[in-house]
């Protein structure tokens, strides 16, 4: 379950962050408008990918994914746009990923 969860979160991050980046490029950076169309399709794929998580709780999955989105956005910016996260960016991303781990893998008893 851990590997599947991580893979699905990574795929969702690529789809959502990549989709948003494509729209940004079309709107803000003067790229062709069809880039925005590809971005919208990628954002739709993100919604589908997120629904493949084993946990049935929409709120839990999306809340946990939020932490992945924070860290993934910083990585995307560094790799694709040359953005250099500072130590506070990195610390914030680590805190978010710790939150993801607590939400997704914290021990839950009956009724928790």
From Swiss-Prot:
Question: Subcellular localization, per the record?
Answer: Cell membrane
Topology within the bilayer:
Multi-pass membrane protein
The cellular component terms of Gene Ontology attached to this UniProt record, alphabetical and capped at eight, are: plasma membrane
- Subcellular location, principal: membrane
Membrane-spanning ranges: 6-26, 32-52, 61-81, 87-107
Record keywords: Cell membrane, Membrane, Transmembrane, Transmembrane helix
Keyword set includes Transmembrane: yes
Annotated InterPro entries: UPF0060 (IPR003844)
Membrane among keywords: yes
**Alphabetized NCBIfam families for the sequence:** PRK02237.1
Which protein family is named in the record? Belongs to the UPF0060 family.
According to UniProt, the name of this protein is UPF0060 membrane protein CMM_0279
């Amino acid at each position: 379950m851990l590997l599947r969860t991580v893979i699905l979160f990574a795929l969702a991050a690529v789809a959502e962050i990549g989709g948003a980046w494509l729209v940004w490029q079309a709107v803000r950076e003067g790229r062709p408008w069809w880039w925005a169309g590809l971005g919208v399709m990628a954002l739709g794929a993100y919604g589908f990918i997120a629904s493949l998580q084993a946990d049935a709780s929409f709120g839990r999955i999306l809340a946990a994914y939020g932490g992945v989105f924070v860290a993934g956005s910083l990585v995307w910016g560094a790799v694709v746009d040359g953005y250099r996260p500072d130590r506070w960016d990195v610390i914030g991303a680590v805190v978010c990923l710790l939150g993801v781990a607590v939400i997704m893998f914290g021990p839950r008893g009956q009724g928790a």
